[in-house]
Each structure stands twice: as structure tokens, then as C-alpha cells.
Amino acid sequence: MARVCSVCGKGTTFGHNVSHSNRRTNRRWVANLKRVHGRFPDGKVRTAYVCVKCLKAGKVEIL
């Protein structure tokens, strides 16, 4: 699984955890994806991974 939203393309982003002493360690933020069976903006019905932001916005009709 590529951890990318099938609708908007949102994926993993990288950054740092910053402690009080300003030490920086690598970390990543992963998109909140759900496996959804539904009708997508292109009109096709399929199962795919969609971020919760797209689900809340109604970009996918859940079947």
C-alpha cells in the first residue's frame, strides 16, 4: 500500500520532532486513510484508500 489518497493524492510528509533543547529527530506524518468501497469522482465504483478529509467533504459516495 502506497499510503496515498486515491482522490486528492495526499500522502506521507516528513519533518522533525523538536525537543526543548532543540534537538531534531526525523519523523513522518501519515495520511489518515480508510479502505472504502464506493463511487468515485470519475464515476467508477471500486475499492480504494481514501483520506478522511475527502470522505467528510463528500467526494466519494460510499456504497
From Swiss-Prot:
Pfam families: Ribosomal_L28. One of its GO terms (molecular function) is structural constituent of ribosome. Keywords: Ribonucleoprotein, Ribosomal protein. Gene3D superfamilies: Ribosomal protein L28/L24. InterPro entries: Bacterial_rp_bL28, Ribosomal_bL28, Ribosomal_bL28/bL31-like_sf, Ribosomal_bL28_bact-type, Ribosomal_bL28_sf. One of its GO terms (biological process) is translation. GO terms for cellular component: ribonucleoprotein complex; ribosome. The keyword DNA-binding does not apply. The keyword Ribosomal protein applies. Belongs to the bacterial ribosomal protein bL28 family. NCBIfam families: L28. This is Large ribosomal subunit protein bL28. It comes from Coprothermobacter proteolyticus (strain ATCC 35245 / DSM 5265 / OCM 4 / BT).
